[in-house]
């Protein structure tokens, strides 16, 4: 479902895919090739949410922001059951299944991985190429070139899947 809030309708690129079982509301921009999957919620009611190109928000995830807004980069994989309340997520990041990124001036730089189940606390600044694990999240290493290639393949897969779903019609 795509709805306006306070008279502001989400702006969704024609090449993006939004499942009819997702909820996208308010001041939201979704870039080309991006996909929002069933059960996911993208709320631009407190602040603007910008989702870049070729980014996927997988099933049952929430993307929201406070009044500062949120910018999610290009080629980002937001896994299943993720709560993303972060202010800035860089390009080529993976927010793995079940992780939580709390808002309040939180920034994750390019090429980062937030591991499954990890919790990034508010006001955290995660430097580029970091691998974050645990509760609270701590940097446990650097993302390798091999991992970046694998993550890009995963992002590309979701671009293709989104296009197939658009072509084949609605999810039933």
Ranges and model annotations:
Residues 1-11, 45, 53, 59-60, ...:
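Glycine-rich hexapeptide-repeat left-handed beta-helix
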